[in-house]
Amino acid sequence: MAVKIRLKRMGAHKKPFYRIVVADARSPRDGRFIEEIGYYNPVSEPKEIKINNEKAEKWLKNGAQPTDTVKDLFKKNGIIE
């Protein structure tokens, strides 16, 4: 089973809010997920990012592949170099 760490879009029309989730790569963007590990709010000033570092590191060690956007968020939080 290929596992990805990616963003799940939520929020109102034109006001996106994203949850950072671990999901099977075959499931739809806003579909089923295995575990929620944080959230990202690009609308608020300043942009709000909250990630559970322990869960993120656990999933990365288990082979989960982050998407490009999530990889950038992890770099900002110091989870990966």
UniProtKB/Swiss-Prot annotation:
It comes from the Bacteria. Transmembrane segments: none annotated. GO terms for biological process: translation. The keyword Ribosomal protein applies. GO terms for cellular component: cytoplasm; small ribosomal subunit. Keywords: Ribonucleoprotein, Ribosomal protein. GO terms for molecular function: structural constituent of ribosome. InterPro entries: Ribosomal_bS16, Ribosomal_bS16_CS, Ribosomal_bS16_dom_sf. The keyword Protein transport does not apply. PROSITE patterns: RIBOSOMAL_S16. Belongs to the bacterial ribosomal protein bS16 family. PANTHER family: 30S RIBOSOMAL PROTEIN S16, SMALL RIBOSOMAL SUBUNIT PROTEIN BS16M. HAMAP family: Ribosomal_bS16. This is Small ribosomal subunit protein bS16. It comes from Alkaliphilus oremlandii (strain OhILAs) (Clostridium oremlandii (strain OhILAs)).
